[in-house]
Amino acid sequence: YVRAINEGNYQAAAELEIARSSFDPFIEQKTSSRVSGYYDGTNLTQRFSNPFEDFNGSVYTEYRISDGDFPVYEADYETLSGGEASVGIAISLLKNRELDKRRTELANAGLATSQWQALATSLINDFVYKGVSEYVAWYESALQVNAVTELLNTATQRERALVTRVEKGDLANVVLTEFKANILQQRLLLAELKQKRDAHAQMLSFYWRSPKGDMLIVDEANPPKDINWPFWVGNGQLMTLRNALRNHPELDVMKLEQQVVNNKAALASNALLPKLDLKASVARDIGSGPSNLDGTETKVGLSFSYPLGNRKAKAEQAQLQSKQRELEHKLTSTEQAITQRFEQALVYWGQAKDIVALQSENAALAKTLSKVEKTRFDAGDSDMFVLNARAQNEIKARIKEIKAKVDLLKAELTLYKEAAMLHSLNN
């Protein structure tokens, strides 16, 4: 998935290079020859042109050579025996002077590259969030399986002791039956937790990859003692995350889109201007021939045009101005939505910390009560119903404690996700 996103960067870079190609120099050649009729003139023209961005300009050099006779209306084709060499420049003075379609496409191609980079950051941020979320979900299930397994092993050992007491006649058989029923409930719970753990492990293998991109098998039964959690949150991190909201990739994409529309709007305004182009050249013929072709020739030309009405440009300008206002409203709405999501995640994180403390205290208390109840039962001061209830409460409290701790990890992860900081940590 990440490799596919990176390919998008290469495609955006290629689009930028395509836009730059509008200013590539080029060579052209034209040949004309009269093959029949009274006149037998032949003309060859070669030109090298090099466009440049300023003033929609272009510089060129040209070489012409002709042979034979031309009619009067084609006298411009005539050159001396060695041909004519010239150099010239063409620029725009009004319309297309400050910008034109090529320069706008080049600017927007650069913005499109930046847009894709911002979008790729957002996509990778979401992808990392999904992968890490799947990891902590597996981690939670695996810890719960281990906790219930540990308590179940203790209960199984106690079952053996109860069997011995029943065989000796110290306890009624119904007491053992009640205890076995409680163990069966614990085994059913363990089976459900293992099913959940294995499902998350299977999903996690999609995100767990080798450096070559191959999926790796997760050891679902052995969670690490320390996952080296990189997304912890403190006061310093909160300040960093909050500041990162101003540079959120979703906002970058929209701001860059605004610049694209602004460029298009400027181009539409440019289309309303009259067209006034200047062309100047210096030419000199070489060799022998008519005297009127000898010497240096300088040419300066102006061309002017303006479409009456120009309804298309005016309509495009109005359309783009409306688009500018639309994007401004969307940007404000997106900024508010990003801030709201972050603040909501912040509230959840604060509550998650309090719940962890309470659930840890509750688990410790449930463990103590279960231990005390076992002592009372062995002394004959309690019955199996109360003992089983204490054991069930201990298991539930332990599971809730694990869930609360993992929920805190999820809350911290969500803060990084909403600030779009997972991508930077992944790098």
Feature map (PLM): residue ranges:
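Long, K/E/R/D-enriched contiguous segments that form extended
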Residues: 224-231, 236-252, 256-259, 267-281, ...
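Sec/SRP-type N-terminal targeting helices
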Residues: 3-8, 20, 55-82, 94-119, ...
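Small/polar, glycine/serine/threonine/aspartate-rich low-complexity segments that form flexible
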Residues: 30-91, 222-233, 266, 279-318, ...
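Short, solvent-exposed, mixed-charge loop/turn linkers that connect secondary-structure elements
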Residues: 170-172, 191-240, 383, 410-427
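N-terminal cofactor/phosphate-binding cores enriched in small/glycine residues
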Residues: 1-30, 34, 40, 47
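Metallo-beta-lactamase
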Residues: 193, 249, 404
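Amphipathic alpha-helical coiled-coil segments
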Residues: 2-19, 123-148, 157, 164, ...
